[in-house]
Amino acid sequence: MMNLLSSDGVQVLPRPFTLNERRREVRSFVLRQGHFTPAQKRAFDHYWPRFGVDFIGQLRDLDVLFGRSAPKVLEVGFGNGAALRFAAQHEPRYDYIGIEVYAPGVGRLLNGLAEDGSRHVRLYHYDAVEVLNKEIADGALDEIRIYFPDPWHKKRHHKRRLIQPLFATLLVRKLRVGGCLHMATDWADYAEQMWDVLDATPGLVNRAGLRGQVPCPDWRVQTRFERRGQNLGHRVWNLLYDRV
């Protein structure tokens, strides 16, 4: 079964699915599309051909996709796109791939990218596991970023968390040697699970040492919700792993 996750871990229907694909999906969760504004709907019509990548289930040459050879950065579950948009504005030497299944977030980022005149960002509105398995070659990525995945705070729901051993192994395959994996969470027990999983995954080494964390890197913008939480004493864990 596909593991369809938005940036906050909510399973939702991705845009490219056909009716037959929806019928054969076995789901044990409530689907949520959220509030889709007219502007976000127009963004799909006007800007998807420019920034969007339709899932075809075949490996892609990423240099051909972007029309140049540059380091490739993937953000899984970009939410409303704030971090991805910020990175594209401030690190134009990179090519960015974003994956998100929550349609309003994709629409919002499409509008933002068009406003910025971005040329080095491509978006999937699809399942990240499927994209990684079928469209991105092993060793093709220089960085993978996953920010604030849903913590599924109830213990009985921990199995739904994105960061699991099989997924971590998949990420390692897609990173080139010398690349890095950056994750952020504001849930202590999810940080513990991330350490448990990633420290046990061959090919990954914590840059800050065993069960270590790093300050928020310059490439990740802090959201107003994050800043508000920190003002209330909430912690954020930034985990940075090197691919070896």
From Swiss-Prot:
UniProt EC number: 2.1.1.33
In terms of superkingdom, the source organism counts as: Bacteria
The residues annotated as the active site are 150
Which SUPFAM superfamilies does UniProt cross-reference here?
S-adenosyl-L-methionine-dependent methyltransferases (SSF53335)
A Gene Ontology molecular function term for this protein is: tRNA (guanine(46)-N7)-methyltransferase activity
Q: Which residues are substrate-binding?
A: 154, 186, 223-226
Where do the annotations place S-adenosyl-L-methionine binding? 75, 100, 127, 150
Keywords for the protein's UniProt record, in alphabetical order: Methyltransferase, S-adenosyl-L-methionine, Transferase, tRNA processing
List, alphabetically, the PANTHER family matched.
3-DEOXY-D-MANNO-OCTULOSONIC-ACID TRANSFERASE/TRNA GUANINE-N 7 - -METHYLTRANSFERASE, PENTACOTRIPEPTIDE-REPEAT REGION OF PRORP DOMAIN-CONTAINING PROTEIN
Entry similarity comment: Belongs to the class I-like SAM-binding methyltransferase superfamily. TrmB family.
The UniProt function text for this chain reads: Catalyzes the formation of N(7)-methylguanine at position 46 (m7G46) in tRNA.
The protein's name is tRNA (guanine-N(7)-)-methyltransferase
Question: What is the organism of origin for this protein?
Answer: Xylella fastidiosa (strain M12)
Gene for this chain = trmB
